[in-house]
Regions:
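OB-fold and OB-like single-stranded nucleic-acid-recognition modules
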Residues: 1-125
Length: 125
């Protein structure tokens, strides 16, 4: 993926690498627009107006598969269903969120549209 593109396009096969990159170095994405496909996760806190698009990632072996998502502010978040596939286009900002217990990348949705599931529903490195 090209981090200097007007819209950083994250392909299905690049999700795990991008997720690690944006969570380890969020400041380099601050102010950027990103587009990626992911599954909807509902947040236990901040339910109103937020969801967490992301995917299941396997870092080592089957036992360590976990859902990795980013908090996303979206006015119609309540209309989304858990595990539904969507394409998200959003701007990135780095600020406090309880999910991180500190600062981290927060998405603000520009557009959220239904999507077909990824060919591989578990992303790997």
């Amino acid at each position: 993926f090209d981090i200097n593109a007007p819209v950083v396009e994250i392909g299905d096969d690049d999700f795990a690498l991008w997720y690690r990159d944006i969570t380890e170095e969020p400041k380099k994405y601050d102010g950027k627009t990103v587009r990626f496909k992911g599954q909807v996760a509902r947040l236990k806190k901040d339910r109103d107006g937020y969801f967490a698009p992301g995917g299941f990632v396997m870092t080592c072996c089957v036992e360590d598969i976990a859902f990795m998502g980013l908090p996303c502010k979206y006015a119609d978040a309540a209309s989304l269903h858990a595990r539904e596939w969507v394409t998200v286009e959003a701007t990135v900002s780095v600020r406090f969120h309880a999910l991180y217990r500190g600062t981290g990348p927060i998405l603000t949705a520009i557009r959220v549209t239904p999507a077909e599931p990824a060919k591989n529903e578990v992303a790997t490195f």
